[in-house]
């Protein structure tokens, strides 16, 4: 849930590619956290349950998908500024999600295709 809401809304991805990329990013982040040492994994998963529940409750009353995205983004920014475990977990998820997102083959291909030609 958290990874899916933190994945960038990137206009270069096709509608068919986006769900596959989001699920692969979520799988990659989840796998990385599962491989972490127990004390880190336990803390991240404990805080993630609370953050995920709050995210569901905050976005439930919002209108369309854009309103939900804006609400969750504001909530994550608020948490990220807070000291303590909640802010650290959001920063962890945000950085891992971005790294996994740009590591996906469709995203890398679109980035290379969108790069302007270099002149010598």
From Swiss-Prot:
TM region positions: 47-63
Entry protein name: Uncharacterized protein y4nI
Key word Membrane present: yes
Topology in the lipid bilayer: Single-pass membrane protein
Protein keywords: Membrane, Plasmid, Transmembrane, Transmembrane helix
Location, primary (coarse class): membrane
Subcellular location: Membrane
Gene Ontology terms: cellular component: membrane
